[in-house]
UniProtKB/Swiss-Prot annotation:
Residues 144-160 have a biased composition (Basic residues). It is found in: Cytoplasm. The keyword Cytoplasm applies. Belongs to the UreE family. Keywords: Chaperone, Cytoplasm, Nickel. This is Urease accessory protein UreE. It comes from Thioalkalivibrio sulfidiphilus (strain HL-EbGR7). InterPro entries: UreE, UreE_C_dom, UreE_N, UreE_N_sf. The lineage of its organism: Bacteria, Pseudomonadati, Pseudomonadota, Gammaproteobacteria, Chromatiales. GO terms for molecular function: nickel cation binding; unfolded protein binding. Residues 1-16 have a biased composition (Basic and acidic residues).
Amino acid sequence: MLTFTKRCDDHGKTPDHSLSLPFETRQKSRFRAQFEDGTPVGVVLDRGLILRHGDVLESDEGVRVRIEAAPEPVSQVRGTDPLLLARACYHLGNRHVVLQIDADGLRYLHDHVLDDMVRGLGLTVGFTHAPFEPEAGAYAGGHAHGHGGHGHHHAHGHEH
């Protein structure tokens, strides 16, 4: 099985394949998938790396694959009032909901309970299948948010 072990910063060479993956899979550092023709592949990357649409991975044999964000069930929030959208971000963030924030609204993985909450704030919520590319988060370039493996403690202002 072809195994992809590194992310390429050099996008000069055209990828040999593409791999369409939902966000849940793109968060994992180790997984199996398959190309559209059914060829099985493996991905083994450093922990904590989230694959983004357009990333290119390379195998030890030099084969390259372009990652694509697969369409998946998402809730699409639309509104013209920036304050209402900010309130929705606040309430969804308090629930640790992963969000895609665009110029004209928000997207999150579909959840009817969250949809009802957001509608209660006065926003319009629709359902669609679309690529989901959420915000990387405040700690994207730093250390992992978990506490396993290090000996000191620090407060975050919220419970885990």
